[in-house]
């Protein structure tokens, strides 16, 4: 290479470096200016539920932080597919993001009819925590813990069943994971919500159920139901008296998480700004108390850690799921 060519190459490298530097400064500037207009927070569930309440807590706090309105838009239907698709199709500029949950991972593992690719079309922002999910039984059920339940199920294969609040929920996956890891055959009975499930359990129509602790708590306190274990990998700080199923089956974890995601392709600086602000809100005493009152454990994760968590969930759930292969109603 002669001196002229070497000089020309050096100028190209300098120009490339200058362009990259300008691009980086532009992205940082965009993140600092964000948001420049009202922000839409999509919730793929109907108004009034736990996800809707949680979204509105964060929307109010972020609105005060940004001095911009944050509008919660409920888009239920299709087993959260409608709201998730609307998020995936939005402009990746940070002005539309969503509060999603375990159904994102479960649908990706179970369903073949999704109009989006959860791993490719969405960008995780931050996980905020998860609902404590419990395995409950009627007070006079013949097992008082998971170890005794496994022994009972092995002695009487295929005779015990567990209830959940529906197909494709974290409660169903918790039961299927228990089957998978313990080598037992509990039959799944899906319910349309938890109210009828509790009635049937108390009435001895079904012996076991997985549910969110906060919704079962009144029945547990009254002595009508008892807790055999929680589905998180360790005891819940909200309910430390209840053992984790993982104490009997190491590695067991099937949580009903809550976190925020945006359309894929969002500038990393904007993702970082969103994550920083969401996690800052999460760290405030008022929000932490509101989440505890809802039975949600604070378990924060930033974008990279959250993405790795979702991918790990998809792999684990794919191992144990029976594909639905049909659209949700």
Task: Outline where the language-model segments fall.
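N-terminal secretory signal peptides
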Residues: 1-28
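N-terminal (or domain-start) structured segment
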Residues: 30-120, 159-161, 184-212, 300, ...
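An extracytoplasmic/periplasmic, membrane-proximal ligand-sensing/linker region
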Residues: 36-38, 181, 221, 268-329
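Residue-level signal for nonpolar/aromatic packing positions in well-ordered secondary structure
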Residues: 39-41, 48, 55, 72, ...
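Hinge/capping helix and adjacent helix->loop/strand transition within the periplasmic-binding protein
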Residues: 89-95, 109-196, 245, 250, ...
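A ligand-binding cleft/hinge motif common to bilobed small-molecule-binding domains
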Residues: 104-113, 179-181, 208-241
């Amino acid at each position: 290479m002669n001196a002229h060519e070497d000089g020309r190459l050096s100028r190209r490298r300098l120009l490339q470096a200058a362009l990259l530097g300008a691009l980086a400064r532009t992205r940082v500037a965009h993140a600092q200016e964000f948001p420049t207009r009202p922000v839409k927070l999509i919730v793929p569930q109907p108004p009034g539920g736990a996800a809707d309440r949680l979204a509105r807590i964060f929307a109010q706090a972020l609105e005060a932080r940004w001095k911009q309105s944050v509008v919660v838009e409920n888009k239920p239907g299709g087993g959260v597919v409608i709201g998730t698709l609307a998020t995936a199709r939005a402009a990746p500029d940070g002005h539309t993001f969503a509060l999603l949950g375990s159904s994102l991972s479960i649908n990706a593992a179970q369903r073949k009819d999704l109009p989006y690719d959860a791993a490719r079309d969405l960008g995780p922002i931050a996980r905020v925590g998860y609902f404590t999910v419990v395995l409950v039984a009627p007070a006079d059920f013949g097992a008082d813990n998971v170890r005794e339940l496994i022994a009972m199920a092995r002695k009487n294969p295929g005779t015990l069943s567990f209830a959940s609040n529906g197909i494709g929920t974290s409660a169903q996956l918790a039961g299927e994971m228990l089957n998978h890891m313990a080598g037992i055959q509990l039959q799944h009975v899906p319910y349309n919500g938890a109210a009828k499930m509790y009635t049937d359990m108390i009435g001895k129509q079904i012996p076991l159920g997985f549910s969110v602790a906060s919704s079962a708590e009144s029945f547990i306190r009254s002595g009508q139901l008892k807790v055999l274990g929680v589905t998180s990998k360790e005891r819940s700080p909200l309910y430390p008296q209840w053992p984790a199923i993982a104490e009997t089956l190491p590695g067991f974890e099937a949580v009903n998480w809550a976190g925020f995601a945006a359309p894929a392709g969002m500038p990393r600086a904007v993702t970082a700004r969103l994550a920083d602000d969401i996690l800052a809100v999460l760290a405030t005493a008022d929000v932490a108390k509101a989440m505890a009152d809802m039975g949600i454990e604070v378990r924060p994760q930033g974008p990279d850690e959250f993405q790795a968590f979702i991918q790990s969930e998809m792999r684990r759930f794919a191992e144990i799921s029976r594909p639905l292969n049909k659209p949700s109603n």
